[in-house]
Amino acid sequence: ENKLICCSSLILVGLTFKNQNKHYRSSLSILQKFIKNNFDNSGFPKSRNPEELMICLKYLILIKEWIKESQNQIPDYLEEIIFNCGKSYSFLSKNLNELPLFNGSSEIKNEEFEKYLNYLNYNFNDNSKEKNGYVIFKDKKIVFIMDIGNSPDFKYSKKYQSGCLSFEITSNKEKLICNLGFDINKNNKIKLLSRSTAAHSTLYLNNHSSCIFRTSYPFKIHHENRLREGLKVVKKKIVIEKDFENIIASHNGYQNRYGYIHERSIKFIKKEKIFLGIDNLIKNKKASN
């Protein structure tokens, strides 16, 4: 998101000074390239970080408003990414007071950002059950969110946390079960601990996480604690019925080290407002015992 903030500054300079039209056009090209390289087709950052989604949406809207005020034409790609980012934000934040703590997100209240959107007359809506590697079950009081997505590519993993199949449950906008979250201001040891599977509401084996992070590079400022070995979700099945909703998903994060696939099934019984869950370790030929 820092690149987007810098890009927005360049665009503002190009719009402010009349003799900087060439600079403005160049800045728009940088913005277009940034969008292409850092977002998936649904408008979600490739890092899969909810906090990054919110920050990027804020600055993308700000850029659009600047261009509109300057009476320049708003690029179609900017309109499209704002629409898609907005829907993804709505998907993750609806009926919640704060962002869910997955994949680098910290404890941020939604209230101020919602005021920002309302002030500028932006209204996004998305009622999907699955999007961006997350699945959501909800009713008027309960919100259940689970991470069922692959780990990101190395270059997008700066804040990634190895919490695949972890979940959060919120009731009346109060969290009952949550992950640890990520704090960029903490020291490197604490940040690394917060990225472990043990810091999430999911299963870990023998004090090992489902992903492995590198902790030393010749140039740490650029590559600190990025992924060395990620994981893939090898199965997911979502069932939506009148009386219940169910997710079954599994990942291969323990396959190379232990020879097991981790499968998790969670069912939300709507009338009773209860959750039933089970974890399975599925043995393959590589498992020693």
What is each of the regions a protein language model found here?
Residues 6, 56-59, 199:
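Catalytic-loop motifs flanking and including active-site residues across diverse enzymes
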Residues 44-178, 182:
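Carbohydrate-active enzyme catalytic cores, enriched for enzymes
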Residues 41, 101-104, 205, 256:
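Generic structural "secondary-structure junction" signal
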Residues 17, 38-45, 92-96, 210, ...:
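Short secondary-structure junctions and interdomain/linker hinges
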Residues 19-22, 32-33, 69, 172-174, ...:
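Secondary-structure boundary elements
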Residues 12, 87-91, 201:
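Generic alpha-helical structural context detector
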Residues 1-51:
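Active-site lining segments of carbohydrate-active enzymes
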Residues 124-289:
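Non-catalytic C-terminal accessory modules of carbohydrate-active enzymes
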